[in-house]
């Protein structure tokens, strides 16, 4: 019987400041967690400078994941970057067909993906952290090569712990600390056959270049996918970058510093149909093709939270062996006795007059076994929201917005 890896991907997008991350090692309440990276130093990554290939791979993966995770008429918020970080670490322990399926879904060979992720430099607006917790009962002999790869390319910490209530507390505290306390309880329980947790946490805090003034905000109505009405605080502004293709219109709204933008995309038809027909190339072309045309933009304030299980969505992307007895994750412990059981994803997103603040956490639970016509975009019915990294051309967060709360 294989030891089961239940891959728990929880992503929370939260509007709120990102405080500085703690640097001290995590010790559980009994003080018995062991820092497995104590004798491992992250090595400089050669040629970690080109994120061009990662842009295409990440956008393709993001749209494909959204298609398979979204439910008709329901709001879903995802951090594909967080999911890819967790799967990237996993791929460093995968071999054979399991690795090939991961590489195909992620859009890059793992060696290239590792270097591309290492080239992405977080800043004051966007922070990313990774950590691994292994069961400290002698059931796993963790590969030093696996730990080295996670340290080199993902900056991961790693701990051996007793996997009792104190370990659950440690993991939850780590996630809370790295998401500015926006995800206080990542794990409700530790499964009795859990052998490893791979955890990613993201935090995004983007302030608008020009915050909305009080006279640009009013009480309005948002019409959900089923035609019902929600009271909404609507925010109006004139933006300079207009989005338009045969299927949608929208706008780009920049955050201070210039690196990130919010892309708000309003389909000509239903959001469900638009998402199902969308692909990565079309999304990149729409955003890259933004025109210097003024647009009167109306954006609702948002308070969103979604929770979903992503194992089926990842299977739909061709990642099958990872979840059954065919899994080969022998790069983690030298044995072919690990597989992935579940992938949980939780996300929270808030947009207001000051900007967008987001946090994300991914946990892999490894168990035993000029004068021109002004355009107008009124976002008073379902639309697609993207937080876009203009520097690396990466989608940091996506949301299919079918409601404002």
Which residue stretches match the model-derived regions?
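Extended hydrophobic
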Residues: 198, 249-265, 371-405
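Composition- and surface-driven signal marking solvent-exposed, interaction-prone regions
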Residues: 211-213, 265, 274-280, 363-364, ...
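Detector for small/aliphatic-rich hydrophobic stretches
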Residues: 4-163
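Non-catalytic, conformational "gating/processing" segments within enzyme and secreted inhibitor domains
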Residues: 27-33, 73, 114-268, 288-370
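Short Gly/aromatic-enriched secondary-structure transition segments
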Residues: 102-104, 212-219, 275-285
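Extracytoplasmic/secreted cell-surface and envelope-processing proteins
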Residues: 96-102, 271-274, 306-308, 359-360, ...
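Short amphipathic beta-strand starts and helix->beta connectors
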Residues: 70-75, 246-248, 280-283
């Amino acid at each position: 019987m294989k030891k089961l890896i239940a891959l728990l991907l929880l992503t929370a997008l939260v509007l709120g400041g990102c405080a500085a991350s703690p640097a001290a090692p995590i010790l559980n309440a009994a003080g018995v967690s062991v820092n497995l990276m104590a004798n491992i130093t992250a090595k400089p990554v050669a040629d970690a400078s080109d994120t061009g290939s990662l842009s295409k791979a990440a956008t393709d993966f993001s749209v494909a994941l959204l298609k398979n995770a979204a439910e008709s008429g329901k709001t879903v918020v995802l951090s594909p970057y967080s999911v890819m970080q967790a799967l990237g670490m996993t791929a460093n322990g995968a071999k054979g067909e399991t690795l090939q399926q991961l590489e195909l879904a992620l859009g890059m060979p793992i060696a290239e993906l590792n270097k591309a992720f290492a080239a992405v430099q977080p800043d004051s607006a966007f922070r990313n952290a990774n950590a691994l917790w292994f069961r400290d009962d002698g059931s796993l002999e963790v590969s030093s090569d696996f730990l080295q790869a996670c340290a080199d390319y993902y900056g991961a910490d790693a701990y051996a712990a007793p996997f009792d209530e104190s370990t659950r507390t440690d993991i939850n505290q780590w996630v809370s600390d790295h998401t500015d306390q926006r995800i206080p309880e990542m794990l409700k329980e530790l499964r009795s056959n859990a052998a490893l947790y791979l955890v990613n946490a993201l935090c995004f805090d983007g302030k608008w270049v020009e915050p909305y003034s009080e006279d640009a905000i009013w009480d309005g109505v948002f019409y959900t996918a089923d035609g019902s009405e929600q009271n909404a605080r609507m925010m109006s502004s004139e933006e300079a970058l207009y989005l338009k293709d045969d299927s949608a219109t929208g706008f780009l709204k920049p955050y201070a510093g210039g690196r990130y933008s919010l892309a708000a995309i309003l389909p000509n038809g239903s959001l469900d149909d638009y998402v199902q027909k969308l692909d990565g190339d079309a999304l990149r072309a729409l955003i890259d093709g933004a025109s210097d045309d003024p647009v009167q933009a109306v954006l609702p304030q948002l308070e969103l939270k979604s929770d979903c299980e992503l194992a089926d969505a990842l299977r739909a992307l061709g990642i099958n062996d990872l979840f059954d007895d065919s899994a080969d994750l022998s790069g983690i412990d030298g044995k072919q006795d690990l597989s992935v059981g579940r992938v949980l994803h939780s996300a929270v997103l808030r947009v207001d007059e000051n900007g967008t603040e987001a946090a994300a956490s991914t946990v892999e639970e490894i168990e035993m076994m000029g004068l021109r016509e002004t355009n107008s975009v009124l976002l008073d019915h379902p639309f697609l929201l993207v937080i876009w990294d203009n520097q690396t051309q990466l989608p940091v967060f996506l949301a299919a917005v079918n409601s404002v709360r």
